[in-house]
Curated annotation (Swiss-Prot):
Protein name (Swiss-Prot/TrEMBL): Uncharacterized protein At1g10890
Domain of life: Eukaryota
Biased composition (Basic and acidic residues): 102-124, 182-259
Location of region: Disordered: 1-124, 177-280
Positions with biased composition (Basic residues): 16-36, 48-83
Organism ancestry: Eukaryota, Viridiplantae, Streptophyta, Embryophyta, Tracheophyta
Pfam families in the cross-refs: ARGLU (PF15346)
Entry-linked PANTHER family: ARGININE AND GLUTAMATE-RICH PROTEIN 1 (PTHR31711:SF1)
Length: 280
């Protein structure tokens, strides 16, 4: 906004002052066109179409009439304008008419710039007014809230709400603690049951292992006893066979002795017989 105000206070250059610096209508026209190209205004398209429709050909002929022996500073632009224009060129204008039309265009441009400046200034003022209004409304609301908070009734209501909130919070905490206690008791009971089951399982496994060990020992003892009994029977059989052999041997020896005794007894009886015979 200060930039717009300074722009509005600064005096605008007069057409006569601009004409003093311009050397020819052709160069003045090109300089204005270059300024319009650098900073286009909201109305540039409309004004350019109007200027294009009515003043392309006259400017071309006018530039030839004013400076016939001087080459234009921008010949390419004239070539483009020449290629665009398809209508026959109207009658030539005088330099005074050209200056008058330039003055009118400058006046329109200044008028548009002034309107644009006023519009921006109004927008800036409206924005400032809106911001100031928002600040005042916020300040009024803040003061109203502070006044309401300072009243005794509001204080009591706030204290009541705080007390209710504290009570509700205590109840929620107590309920949560009770739930956690019950959950911990249930967990401890489940843990005890699991430990008891694990203990019983371990005892059962130990008892089964003991039974298997005892069974293995019993089987081993029975097998050992069976082997000992077999060995004992074998020893008895060997003893019996040995005794039987000894009895047979003894019987054979007795029989042999008897045979010898018989033989000896026969031998003793023969000489007596022979002697008896001889004594006769």
């Amino acid at each position: 906004m200060p930039r717009d105000l300074s722009r509005s206070r600064s005096p605008s250059p007069s057409p006569s002052r601009r004409r003093k610096h311009s050397r020819s209508p052709v160069r003045q026209r090109h300089s204005r066109r270059s300024r319009r190209d650098r900073s286009p205004s909201p109305y540039s398209s409309h004004s350019y179409s109007r200027r294009k429709s009515r003043s392309i050909s006259p400017r071309r002929h006018r530039s030839r009439s004013v400076t016939p022996k001087r080459r234009s500073p921008t010949p390419k632009r004239y070539k483009r304008q020449k290629s665009r224009s398809s209508t026959p060129s109207p009658a030539k204008r005088s330099p005074a008419a050209t200056l008058e039309s330039a003055k009118n265009r400058n006046g329109e441009k200044l008028k548009r710039e002034e309107e644009e400046r006023k519009r921006r200034q109004r927008e800036a003022e409206l924005k400032l007014i809106e911001e100031e209004t928002v600040k005042r409304v916020e300040e009024a609301i803040r003061k109203k809230v502070e006044e309401s908070l300072q009243s005794e009734k509001i204080k009591m209501e706030i204290l009541t709400l705080l007390e209710e909130g504290r009570k509700r919070l205590n109840e929620e905490v107590a309920a949560q603690l009770e739930e956690e206690k019950e959950a911990s008791l249930i967990e401890a009971k489940e843990k005890e049951e699991r430990e008891q089951q694990e203990k019983e399982e371990r005892e059962r496994i130990a008892e089964e292992n003991l039974k298997r060990v005892e069974e293995a020992q019993r089987k081993e003892a029975m097998e050992r006893q069976r082997k000992e009994e077999e060995r004992y029977r074998e020893l008895e059989e060997l003893q019996r066979q040995k005794e039987e052999a000894m009895r047979r041997k003894k019987a054979e020896e007795e029989e042999e002795r008897l045979k010898q005794m018989k033989l000896l007894g026969k031998n003793k009886s023969r000489p007596k017989l022979s002697f008896a015979l001889s004594s006769k």
